[in-house]
From Swiss-Prot:
This is Ferredoxin-3. Pfam families: Fer4_10. Its cofactor is [4Fe-4S] cluster. Binds 2 [4Fe-4S] clusters. The gene is fdxB. InterPro entries: 4Fe4S_Fe-S-bd, 4Fe4S_Fe_S_CS, FdIII_4_nif, Fe-S_Ferredoxin. It comes from Rhodobacter capsulatus (Rhodopseudomonas capsulata). One of its GO terms (molecular function) is metal ion binding. Residues 17-46, 70-100 form the 4Fe-4S ferredoxin-type domain.
Length: 101
């Protein structure tokens, strides 16, 4: 049975939590990051080989020349409250959400 939450007005809804971001579909626009105040995701680099690398790390310094685009990465899934705001603003539909059971 999925988790049920309530609005302030008492209406029931089922939170859908961010489970995954498809780095191949993500365009790195940052819209999801802007609407989420919970530190659920952050901007990373994607290399030619498909490796997702966090900025400011030793790994980033090693592969910086190989980064082909910047993408959002799920870095704080435990902070997601299941509101779905990120999905509503995503133009590339690169996120997977699911209810908890």
């Amino acid at each position: 049975m999925p988790t049920v939450a309530y609005t302030r007005g008492g209406a029931e809804y089922t939170p859908v939590y961010l489970m995954k971001i498809d780095e191949q579909k993500c365009i790195g626009c940052g819209r999801c990051f802007k609407v989420c105040g919970r530190d659920v995701m952050s901007l990373h680099g994607l290399t030619e080989d498909g490796q997702v690398v966090a900025p400011g790390t030793d790994e980033w310094d090693e592969v910086e020349d190989e980064i082909v685009k910047k993408v959002m990465a799920l870095t704080g899934a435990e902070n997601c409250i299941g509101c779905g705001a990120c999905a509503r603003v995503c133009p590339s539909e690169c996120q997977t959400h699911a209810a908890l059971s």
